[in-house]
């Protein structure tokens, strides 16, 4: 089981977007994630009439390494590490600081 999944709210730990929060849009591969509003770049797109693409300057979200983000703990308001606990025969993700289940309503 992965520690960070699609739909999790994360906070960026390093880089130009440090301390910015966002929701994980997708896992690109084992160690990269797409985070909403983080690592957005402007790409100069050439027009392509065959593909009905007008071209221009397009904003694109690039992947960020999973080691540069941490799960946001709403109870503490800070970044938190993730651990695993077995509950009712299932493996559940929990916050390391307070032991609360990830995604559980407070």
Curated annotation (Swiss-Prot):
Record's keyword annotation contains Nuclease: no
KW Amino-acid biosynthesis (keyword) present: no
Transmembrane segments: none
Any one cellular-component term (Gene Ontology): ribosome
GO biological process, one term: translation
InterPro entries: Rib_uL2_dom2 (IPR014722), Ribosomal_uL24 (IPR003256), Ribosomal_uL24_CS (IPR005825), Ribosomal_uL24_KOW (IPR041988), Translation_prot_SH3-like_sf (IPR008991)
Keyword terms of this UniProt record: Ribonucleoprotein, Ribosomal protein, RNA-binding, rRNA-binding
Superkingdom of the source species: Bacteria
Single annotated GO MF: rRNA binding
A matching Pfam family: ribosomal_L24
Family from the record: Belongs to the universal ribosomal protein uL24 family.
Reported function: One of two assembly initiator proteins, it binds directly to the 5'-end of the 23S rRNA, where it nucleates assembly of the 50S subunit. One of the proteins that surrounds the polypeptide exit tunnel on the outside of the subunit.
Subunit record text: Part of the 50S ribosomal subunit.
Protein name, entry field: Large ribosomal subunit protein uL24
Species of provenance: Bordetella avium (strain 197N)
């Amino acid at each position: 089981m992965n520690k960070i999944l699609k739909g999790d709210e994360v906070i960026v730990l390093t880089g130009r977007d440090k301390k910015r929060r966002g929701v994980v849009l997708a896992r690109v591969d084992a160690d990269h994630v797409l985070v909403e509003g983080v690592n957005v770049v402007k790409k100069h797109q050439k027009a392509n009439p065959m593909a009905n693409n007008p071209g221009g300057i397009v904003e694109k979200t690039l992947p960020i390494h999973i080691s540069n983000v941490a799960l946001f703990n709403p109870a503490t308001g800070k970044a938190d590490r993730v651990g695993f606990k077995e509950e009712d025969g299932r493996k559940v993700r929990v916050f390391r600081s307070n032991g609360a289940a990830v995604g559980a309503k407070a």
